């Protein structure tokens, strides 16, 4: 039987508990998440990294291409999708997007904790403190007061040093699946692998013992066909399309994979060579520019170190490639949008699951390939031939689906063309899907007003205990 605690013993217990709580709040031994800690020791790198804040403009990708709303019907990207900005905005943008919803508490909202995984050095800190089981458990809102420092120093570097590291266990496992463990890689390979922690295709596992864990689908390789076969084998889907009822795959941003396929990757030209070149400060000292950006903005330090052609010549070639990719992208989207509406019509007139299965497989594969190509930001520069090849197969598979749909619809007595609603603007496309955008936007504004100040206050209090 427990003895009754005296006032003195109770006070001592409280003191011990408080000390443990304080210790638990300390920054990790391996990870210092606060980027500003390094602003003096690595001033040139810090200041250039901070310049990624100069990409203030928000580009609404759905407004620029309303077909995307239909292609992602039933998924968060149909609500909101902006072009990516600089690293300084990683936490801000994931907080503000409609995709993360408007949670009112730590257990609320549509998205899992895994949605923070590439946004902050607080992520490796949390994994080190809680283990992957603890980190990945729960909803996105659980991480709100914890994940507050944007992508920065400790994501790519060992604590307090320039030495490169992979800071996320799931990325380490991905590299090992390719037979290229980080600790045995060359310096050049490591310069791209640190980018490949996040600029990759990934998915959230659904197994009970690993539910919500991030995984790279590289067990069979990194081509679009190899990953497609992997997903099919495990019967994985990101969501079910609200029109066609297709079990869909959403490509993320497989920049690392497509870079490997292109001429630069094959010739050992790293991400850093083109996007973070060595530059000289006003004292004549060289350092790595951490304002990740377009190589043409620093042509002499990037392209000109290998190419003898002029900036105008190389820019012209790149623009031509972008134009060709954009043209084939639009053709694939046109076929896919029609396929989704035609599939919806087929269900409406009594199509069976057995009749629809081969059609939905074609739609699934076509859109996965289209998405893989367009979500690879920079693919027209990294691997234009591969982008065009993939988009060509997307067009073919979408066309195959539509031929099968035409035959099935005719069998069901539908011989006229299936009507497509007006989706000429983002608003019209969302209205065609019955999306209540006014309600979503109002809820998001309330979340930003009510929850974000609480998250920031809690984070500030916790970080005040750091040494």
From Swiss-Prot:
Which stretches are transmembrane? none
Q: Does the keyword Disulfide bond apply?
A: no
Q: Which reaction does it catalyse?
A: 6 Fe(III)-[cytochrome c] + NH4(+) + 2 H2O = 6 Fe(II)-[cytochrome c] + nitrite + 8 H(+)
Q: Which residues bind heme c 2?
A: 153, 156-157, 290
Enzyme class at the top of the EC tree: oxidoreductase
Q: How is the cofactor bound?
A: Binds 1 Ca(2+) ion per monomer. Binds 5 heme c groups covalently per monomer.
GO MF annotations in UniProt: calcium ion binding; heme binding; iron ion binding; nitrite reductase (cytochrome, ammonia-forming) activity
Keyword annotations from UniProtKB, A to Z:
Calcium, Electron transport, Heme, Iron, Metal-binding, Oxidoreductase, Periplasm, Signal, Transport
Q: EC number(s) per UniProt?
A: 1.7.2.2
Say which domain of life the source belongs to: Bacteria
List, separated by semicolons, the cofactors it needs: Ca(2+); heme c
CDD domains linked to this entry: NrfA-like (cd00548)
Q: Which cysteines share a disulfide bond?
A: none
Q: Where does heme c 4 bind?
A: 271, 274-275, 382
Annotated binding of substrate, by residue = 202, 253
Q: Where does Ca(2+) bind?
A: 201-202, 250, 252
Q: Kindly indicate where the leader peptide sits in this chain.
A: 1-27
State where heme c 3 binds. 87, 195, 198-199
The protein's location, in the record's own words, is: Periplasm
> One Pfam family from the UniProt entry?
Cytochrom_C552
**UniProt-listed PANTHER family:** CYTOCHROME C-552, CYTOCHROME C-552 RESPIRATORY NITRITE REDUCTASE
| Family per similarity comment | Belongs to the cytochrome c-552 family.
Please give the function described in this protein's UniProt entry: Catalyzes the reduction of nitrite to ammonia, consuming six electrons in the process.
In its UniProt entry, what is this protein called? Cytochrome c-552
Q: Which organism is it from?
A: Shewanella sp. (strain MR-4)
């Amino acid at each position: 039987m427990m003895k009754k605690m005296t006032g003195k013993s109770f006070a001592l217990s409280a003191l011990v508990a408080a000390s443990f709580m304080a210790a638990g709040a300390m920054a990790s031994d391996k990870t210092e998440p606060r980027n500003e800690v390094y602003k003096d020791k690595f001033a040139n790198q810090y200041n250039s990294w901070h310049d990624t804040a100069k990409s203030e403009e928000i580009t609404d990708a759905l407004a620029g291409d309303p077909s995307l709303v239909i292609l992602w019907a039933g998924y968060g990207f149909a609500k909101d999708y902006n072009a990516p900005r600089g690293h300084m905005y990683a936490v801000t943008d994931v907080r503000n997007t409609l995709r993360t919803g408007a949670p009112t508490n730590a257990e609320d909202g549509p998205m899992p904790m895994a949605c923070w995984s590439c946004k902050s050095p607080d992520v490796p800190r949390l994994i080190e403190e809680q283990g992957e089981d603890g980190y990945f458990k729960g909803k996105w809102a659980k991480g709100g007061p914890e994940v507050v420092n944007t992508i920065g120093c400790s994501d790519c570097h060992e604590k307090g040093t320039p030495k490169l590291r992979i800071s996320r266990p799931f990325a380490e496992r991905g590299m090992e699946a390719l037979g290229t463990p980080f600790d045995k890689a060359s310096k050049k390979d490591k310069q791209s692998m640190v980018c490949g922690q996040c600029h990759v295709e990934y998915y959230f596992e659904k197994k009970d013992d690993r539910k919500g864990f991030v995984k790279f689908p590289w067990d069979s390789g990194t081509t679009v066909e190899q990953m497609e076969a992997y997903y099919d084998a495990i019967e994985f889907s990101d969501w079910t399309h609200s029109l066609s009822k297709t079990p869909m795959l959403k490509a993320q941003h497989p920049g690392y994979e497509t870079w490997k396929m292109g001429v630069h990757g094959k010739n050992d030209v790293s991400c850093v060579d083109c996007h973070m070149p060595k530059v000289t400060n006003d004292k004549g000292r060289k350092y790595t520019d951490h304002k990740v950006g377009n190589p043409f903005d620093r042509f002499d330090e990037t392209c000109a170190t290998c190419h003898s052609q002029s900036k105008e010549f190389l820019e012209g070639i790149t623009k031509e490639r972008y134009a060709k990719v954009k043209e084939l992208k639009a053709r694939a989207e046109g076929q896919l949008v029609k396929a989704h509406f035609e599939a919806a019509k087929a269900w409406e007139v009594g199509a069976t699951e057995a009749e629809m299965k081969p059609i939905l497989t074609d739609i699934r594969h076509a859109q996965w390939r289209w998405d893989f190509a367009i979500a690879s930001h920079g693919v027209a520069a990294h691997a234009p031939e591969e982008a065009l090849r993939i988009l060509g197969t997307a067009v073919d598979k979408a066309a195959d689906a539509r031929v099968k749909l035409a035959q099935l619809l005719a069998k069901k007595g539908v011989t006229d063309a299936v009507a497509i609603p007006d989706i000429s603007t983002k608003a019209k496309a969302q209205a065609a899907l019955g999306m209540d955008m006014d309600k979503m936007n109002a809820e998001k504004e309330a979340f930003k007003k009510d929850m974000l100040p609480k998250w920031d206050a809690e984070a500030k209090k916790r970080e005040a205990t750091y040494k």
